[in-house]
C-alpha cells in the first residue's frame, strides 16, 4: 500500500495530492515533486489552475508582519499553469503515482511536476523558545495550488491550498580514514610533554547512531588527568541577513577515568547526540518540522563546489570536542592546571533509503489517502 497526502482548500473546491513530503537532495540532483490537483469543474470555469513551489527563509515572527515589518524572504518561486495546459508547455511522462491517482480521481484531476533547482537550502527550523508563537525561524518549502484569471490577481487564503514539504539530504557512509587530531602540551616543571590524540573511524554518522571516539593519551608529565570530557557541538551560521553564529552543545559527558603521571591510556568512548536531550534549547537547529511529525537535530549542510553560501540561509555543522581536565599531583593535586583539548569534524545526516523501502502502488486500490485538515489530520481509504 502507498500513502498519499491530501489537503483540501477551505472552500472545498479543490484538493492537492502528493505521494510524499520528503524530497531527497543527493548534492547533484533533487527529486522532482510529482502530484495531482483535483478541482471542481464549475469553480475552474473561466479561470486557470496554478501550482506554485516556494522556498522561503523566515527570520522573524508572524505578528510583526502586521506592523509593516517583513521578516520573510522568498529564495525561490516556481509557478506552473496546470489547467488549461499552456500550448508551449511540455508535459513529461506521468509517474506511476500520477497514473494511479488520475485513474482513481477521474477527469477533473490534473497532474503536475515541479523540479527544485540544485542550489537551494535544505529544510531547517530554529527551535523556538517556550514563549514564542507563530511560525519558527528557518527555511521551509511549500507547495500551493490556486485558481485565478491571472497571476497578478490577489488570491484569498480560502481559495488556495498549501502543503508544506521538506528538502532533505541523505548520504552513504564514505569509505576511507576518519578525522583525527593531536595536540602536545608542555607544562612548567615537567621535562616531558602531554600528548593527546583522538580520532573516529569515519566522519559521516547517521542521526541516532552512536559516535565512537577513540582517545589515546601519553602523559609524560608530573600532572594527573582527573577527567575526560567529550562534547558534541552544533554550529549554526545564519548567513542570509547577517553574520549571526550560534553554538549549542548537543551532547556532553564527563568520564572519570584517571590517568596518573608518567603513564599512558587508551579507550574508545561512545557518544550519541539526540534531540530528546535538547528539547528546551532555544535557537537549536532542527531538520524542518512537519506539524504532525517529530523531527531531529538538523543535518549537516553539504556544500557543492562553488555554491553561494548566502543562498542557503542557514549553514549547520558539528564537531566533537575532547578535553582533558589536568591537575597537579602531590599536595597540589586538588588544584586545576588547565584543559587540554582537540576537535574533530563530524557530519550528521540521514541514511539513503534502500530502493525497495518505499512501496509503489500497482493499482488505484493500493492507495491510502491521509488527509490534512485545518487543525488536525485523519486517515481514510
From Swiss-Prot:
Pfam families: Arrestin_C, Arrestin_N. The keyword Cell wall biogenesis/degradation does not apply. SMART domains: Arrestin_C. InterPro entries: Arrestin, Arrestin-like_C, Arrestin-like_N, Arrestin_C-like, Arrestin_CS, Arrestin_N, Ig_E-set. GO terms for biological process: endocytosis; signal transduction; visual perception. Belongs to the arrestin family. This is Arrestin-C. It comes from Mus musculus. The gene is Arr3.
